[in-house]
């Protein structure tokens, strides 16, 4: 179902209007409380700047960390307000609380084009309970609603879902619109062949995604720690590699399902082993049927990289979610880096490359290739749920186009 977006609202619609914008500002901080990666703040700028240009009064709502419904001084949005002020080139006023007299006074004092950042909504337990009274208090600050927090769209919270019952219009921001366009588009109407690369350490966290992707894709490539559950299910010995014993039957079923559907399901043919889980462990590369006892697999090997590159060469759409190995250790990052480089090359040849959230985004950024990809998703859980074909409450609640 297509959703109405901010693009459909003109300056005449928005001038002097108070617009509540849900953003995803859940950024990492270092021990000194400084922001170490402002990607999520920058991702919201197109929506914020568009609203400023159209003369709206911009009221930003965000969560930060998990304060569990209580005020936590270390989880205030003060560093975010400071960084956003720098990026916008204008002062962003932060409130003491997201609802109540201070928020009301600061919103009432706004002029057209001003930006106010409401304090962490999760300081109130009512936020995650999607409490209607709390949602109404948030909504009372504004005349219209924009949801640009794709990363929180899979949660039915007061600021992502509840407020839409009290604000009209309720529309998708530019980032949300782009996320839906790419991720939904890749699933519903992709240019084919469509391939998915799924990595990460556990099959259990990707079951729904793997099942959905086997239904929709022409090729599914699997890497990361989860491959050892598949190998063990095939009867291979995996040394002391990570295995989910309770998922062996599922691994067999997934392979059988792919075969029955004529989907190419590719697993690595060789792996890079370590004698210990550490950056300077001893390592060796072996075929998957020759893993010795006492060793664990921490990356895919060079033959597997070639196999995966060949499989991807003719693809028109590629979705990547999850690293191929323990890329945080340089010695075991070759597989992940090779996939990042391959996708960057494919993008240059007109392939639509989508990096679906989480660790793969970090890997692509670490390799300096983020700009080369068609789309980098800002959602972790939200991306996975959308790829699984689930309805995201924060999206469903918006006005239909």
From Swiss-Prot:
Binding site for ATP: 206, 297, 328, 357-360
Gene Ontology biological-process entries: gluconeogenesis; glycolytic process
Positions that bind substrate: 24-26, 40, 63-66, 122, 155
Enzyme category, top tier: transferase
Family, similarity comment: Belongs to the phosphoglycerate kinase family.
The keyword DNA-binding is annotated on this UniProt entry: no
InterPro entries on file: Phosphoglycerate_kinase (IPR001576), Phosphoglycerate_kinase_CS (IPR015911), Phosphoglycerate_kinase_N (IPR015824), Phosphoglycerate_kinase_sf (IPR036043)
Natural source organism: Prochlorococcus marinus (strain MIT 9303)
Pfam families per the UniProt record, alphabetical: PGK
Keyword annotations: ATP-binding, Cytoplasm, Glycolysis, Kinase, Nucleotide-binding, Transferase
CDD domains: Phosphoglycerate_kinase
Designated name of the protein: Phosphoglycerate kinase
Subcellular location: Cytoplasm
GO molecular function: ADP binding; ATP binding; phosphoglycerate kinase activity
Main localization category: cytoplasm
Pathway note: Carbohydrate degradation; glycolysis; pyruvate from D-glyceraldehyde 3-phosphate: step 2/5
Gene: pgk
Subunit structure: Monomer.
